[in-house]
Each structure stands twice: as structure tokens, then as C-alpha cells.
């Protein structure tokens, strides 16, 4: 296979995986520390994309739109935690699933009332609209390289924050033994609010960065939420390292299989059948990967230390 095509698909997989990491990192922290299943996590990603598109369209500044999306969605996430989700901590997981599913419907309707049914456009910054020549003959969009760089920087910042700071120590203590951490003076309620706000901010960052590549529309968070759950199952619940490894695995497997499978099937079947069957099999491969990890290591590849 052509080297340029392989390199492009690897970069696409890296970019997709790092965007999944932004969603999965917040989700795995909420699930691992707060022991809460939040189905509305994808809705915060959608809100972030809408805020970025709206503010960017009004001001003409992509950076300002992205900043407003991150700040606004973080505040929304903390308000939701304080007003609604805090009441669910002592409930069973079924109650959490039902309540956060209702929250999905409410947020979808709220977005529809504010911005309408039609998708919003979020334009790529003019300075990043062209390609960059990485190697002779290998051109890659500058904006996608920005996404990769931001994803790597966020991953590094999260690792440093969780492992090298006092707040990170509180987060790890809350994940290991909530009652003991509270007995030692950690304000668990405030910690939960901060963690949920951080998860919402990461969702908004992913939504704002992916807005120029995808349609900003109602319901855009549901499909990517499923992939985020797959990531944390593969990587290990509560583990930032696991979320990063799982995201990269899912991103690379999904991107590579969508390119390689149709080409491989054309050698065995008609082009029409290969074109229709290839993408379907590529989607299944992610769940085959998850099933294999669950069979081999039910706790995930890098589970959080308890």
C-alpha cells in the first residue's frame, strides 16, 4: 500500500483517538471517582460545539468561540452537578441512567429552542485552512495537526495534574476510598463539582475542535458517547492512562479498518458488495476489540489503582 495513504490514515486515527480521549477522560473520572453513570456526557459535547459555533459566528473569532464554549460548558456542568446530579450519588445505577437520559432529552430540546433545527456552521480558522507538507509528497491539513497537538497537550496536562498536584492527590484519594478521603478532610462535594466541571470543559473542547469537521446539530453527542464508553471499558474505568490508550486504539482501529477492509474485500467480492460491507464490518471491529479486552482483562488494560 502507498506510504502516503498509510501515513494519512495513521494521522487521521491519531486525531480521532485524541478527540475521543477528551470525552473519555472526563467520563472515566466521573465514573471512576463519583461512581456515577452519566449518559448526558455527550450532550455537554454538543452544547460545547453549539456555543463555539454561535460565539465564533457572532464575533468572527474561532479562538474566542472555543474559549467561550469551554468556560460556558464547564459552568453548565457544575450547575447540573450542584442542582441535579448530586441528588443521584446515593441512588443505584438504574436511577442514574434514567435521570441522565431524561437530561439528554431536556438538553436536546433546550438547544433546539435556542438555535433551531438547522445545523450551525463552524468555519476553520483562515490561518489553518490549508495543508502542511510533513514529508515530500505527504500533505496533511494544518487544522487536523492542531487538533492532534491540542489533544497531546491536554493528555500531558491531565497526567501532570492527576499525578503531581495536590488536587490530583485528592482525586486519586477520592477514587480509591471516598470515605477515608472525607475523614482525612477532603471536601468530597467540592471535589465532585470540580471533577464534573473539568469533564464538561473537556467535552466542550472536543466539540469546539470537531465543529469545523462535523455538522453541529442536535443529537450529535449520542453516537460519540457510545464510543467514549467503549474507550473506558477497554482502557479501565477511572484511569487517565487507560483512557488515552483506549482512545488511540479505537481511533486507529476504526480509521484503518474503514480504509483497509473495503480494499481487502474487493479481492474476494464484487466492488459493490465490498463498498457496502466494508464500512459495516469496520464499525463492528471496535466492539470485537472491546469484547476481546473484556475476555482477556475484564478490568481493562490499565485499571485505576485502588
Q: Which residue stretches match the model-derived regions?
A:
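Membrane-interfacial amphipathic/re-entrant helices at transmembrane-helix boundaries
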Residues: 1-22, 51, 59-65, 91-96, ...
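Transmembrane alpha-helical segments in multi-pass inner-membrane proteins
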Residues: 60-71, 193-203, 207-208, 213-287
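Transmembrane helix-bundle core of multi-pass membrane transporters
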Residues: 87-164, 191, 256-285, 299-306
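Alpha-helical transmembrane segments within multi-pass membrane transporters and channels
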Residues: 60-104, 110, 245-250, 254, ...
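Helix-loop-helix "hairpin" substructures at the membrane interface of multi-pass membrane proteins
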Residues: 16-17, 137-220, 240-245
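Hydrophobic core segments of alpha-helical transmembrane domains in multi-pass membrane transport
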Residues: 49-54, 70-76, 103-111, 150-159, ...
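Short, non-helical or kinked segments that cap or interrupt transmembrane helices
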Residues: 25-49, 90-95, 167-170, 188, ...
Amino acid at each position: 500500500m502507498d506510504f502516503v495513504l498509510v501515513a494519512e490514515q495513521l494521522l487521521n486515527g491519531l486525531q480521532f483517538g485524541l478527540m475521543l480521549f477528551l470525552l473519555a477522560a472526563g467520563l472515566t473520572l466521573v465514573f471512576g471517582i463519583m461512581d456515577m453513570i452519566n449518559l448526558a456526557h455527550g450532550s455537554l459535547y454538543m452544547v460545547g460545539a453549539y456555543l463555539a459555533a454561535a460565539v465564533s459566528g457572532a464575533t468572527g473569532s474561532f479562538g474566542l468561540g472555543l474559549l467561550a464554549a469551554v468556560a460556558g460548558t464547564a459552568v453548565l456542568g457544575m450547575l447540573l452537578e450542584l442542582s441535579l446530579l448530586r441528588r443521584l450519588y446515593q441512588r443505584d445505577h438504574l436511577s442514574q441512567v434514567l435521570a441522565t437520559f431524561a437530561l439528554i432529552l431536556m438538553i436536546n430540546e433546550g438547544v433546539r429552542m435556542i438555535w433551531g433545527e438547522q445545523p450551525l456552521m463552524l468555519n476553520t480558522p483562515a490561518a489553518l485552512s490549508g495543508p502542511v507538507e510533513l514529508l515530500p509528497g505527504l500533505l496533511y491539513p494544518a487544522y487536523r495537526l492542531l487538533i492532534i497537538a491540542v489533544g497531546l497537550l491536554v493528555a500531558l496536562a491531565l497526567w501532570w495534574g492527576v499525578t503531581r498536584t495536590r488536587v490530583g492527590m485528592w482525586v486519586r484519594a477520592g477514587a480509591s476510598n471516598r470515605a477515608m478521603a472525607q475523614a482525612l478532610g477532603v471536601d468530597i462535594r467540592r471535589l465532585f463539582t470540580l471533577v464534573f466541571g473539568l469533564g464538561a470543559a473537556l467535552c466542550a473542547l472536543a466539540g469546539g475542535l470537531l465543529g469545523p469537521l462535523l455538522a453541529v446539530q442536535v443529537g450529535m453527542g449520542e453516537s460519540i458517547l457510545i464510543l467514549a464508553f467503549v474507550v473506558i471499558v477497554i482502557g479501565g474505568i477511572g484511569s487517565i492512562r487507560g483512557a488515552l490508550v483506549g482512545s488511540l486504539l479505537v481511533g486507529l482501529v476504526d480509521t484503518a479498518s474503514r480504509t483497509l477492509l473495503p480494499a481487502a474485500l474487493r479481492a474476494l467480492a464484487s466492488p459493490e458488495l465490498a463498498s457496502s460491507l466494508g464500512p459495516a464490518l469496520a464499525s463492528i471491529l471496535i466492539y470485537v476489540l472491546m469484547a476481546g479486552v473484556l475476555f482477556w482483562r475484564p478490568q481493562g488494560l490499565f485499571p485505576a489503582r485502588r
